[in-house]
Amino acid sequence: MGYGFALEQNACGWKITTRPAIAPFAELSVDFIGSYPDPATRLEPQLPELAFIGRSNVGKSSLLNALTGRKGLARVSATPGKTQTMNVFQLPEFYLIDLPGYGFAKASKVNRAAYRRLVEGYFTRRETLTGVVWLLDSRHDPSQDDLAFQQLL
């Protein structure tokens, strides 16, 4: 069984939790292939790639888990900046690519700049990139980083 999202309000604000649901990729085999710091890494076999992008902690990894119906497939954390490399998951006919978030992250300026270079390099060099899932936080107006990535897309 897959997982879906439930939005719950508590004393501290809103919380996104998972709940049983039908996940579109739940019946497919999904394998974690690896984490790569270089956007030029060539994946074999060459398959179309669907990338997940958005601010740090917007829910990219959680969405990937929900779509595949595998709660712990992509690592998630309440701490922004958990994903620091290009994390690759292979399905039978395509890859899901979990990218580092942009904006706030509990990392040094040097590391944040490296994450940004990885993401920008990924979008400008990947010939196998066929789709993008761009997550925006509806609680906030688009940031300067959101607008910059809009131009990149």
Residue positions per predicted region:
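Glycine-rich, phosphate-binding/catalytic loops in enzymes
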Residues: 69-70, 112-115, 149-153
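Short, flexible loop segments at the rims of nucleotide/cofactor-binding pockets, characterized by
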Residues: 73-75, 108-112, 137-141
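Conserved C-terminal guanine-recognition region of P-loop GTPase G domains, centered on the G4
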Residues: 120-153
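Short, well-ordered secondary-structure micro-motifs
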Residues: 43, 107-108, 143-147
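Amphipathic alpha-helical transducer elements in NTP-driven molecular machines
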Residues: 83, 112-116, 143-144
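Conserved nucleotide-sensing/catalytic segment adjacent to the nucleotide-binding pocket
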Residues: 92-127
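Conserved G1/Walker A P-loop phosphate-binding module
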Residues: 5-8, 12-104
